[in-house]
Regions:
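Conserved beta-strand in the GNAT
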Residues: 53, 59-69
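A short beta-loop-alpha structural element at the N-terminal edge
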Residues: 1-16
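A short helix-loop-beta-strand connector motif used in the catalytic cores of GNAT acetyltransferases and
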Residues: 41-53
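A conserved beta-turn-beta hairpin within the catalytic core of GNAT-like acetyltransferases
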Residues: 70-81, 136
Length: 144
């Protein structure tokens, strides 16, 4: 598996794989493939956006999107995960994405990394705790 920051040409080449990945994603939210491709293009060249693709045997098997912002009351830079998708059955790749994101966050001088997931699992919880992440509050969602 190869994790890398995509170029415009990579996104064009991997758009069919990206659409397939989004369509096969099994989660509580149903992402729009077209909007995911647009988000990838918008991330290019933006120093405050982190985007990485994971490719295995020429197929896109996952992507990670994150961003940099400032905490309102402390002024500290924070790196926040925006979206992570992996094809079903592609276990073990979250850790590689986390390593890349942490390196980028340090380079950006972020003080904290915030991660959130639409769905949680015991395995994911163990991975996050083992890597030094601690639960920080609770997220709620309501369809309107």
């Amino acid at each position: 598996m190869n994790i890398f920051e995509p170029t415009d040409a990579d996104i064009r080449l991997l758009t069919p794989s990206l659409r397939r990945l989004v369509q096969e994603y099994r989660g509580s939210l149903t992402p729009d493939p077209v909007l995911c491709v647009r988000a990838a293009y918008r991330a290019l060249g933006n120093p405050n956006i982190f985007i990485r693709f994971a490719v295995k045997d020429g197929e896109l098997i996952g992507f990670f999107l994150g961003g940099l912002s400032v905490e309102m009351f402390t002024g500290a830079k924070i790196a926040t995960q925006i979206g992570v998708m992996l094809l079903p059955g592609q276990t073990g790749h979250l850790q590689a994405f986390l390593n890349e994101f942490k390196t980028w966050a340090k380079e950006q001088r972020a003080k904290r990394i915030y991660m959130h997931f639409a769905e949680s699992s015991e395995r994911q919880d163990k991975i996050m705790k083992r890597r030094g992440y601690a639960p920080a509050g609770t997220h709620y969602m309501k369809e309107i």
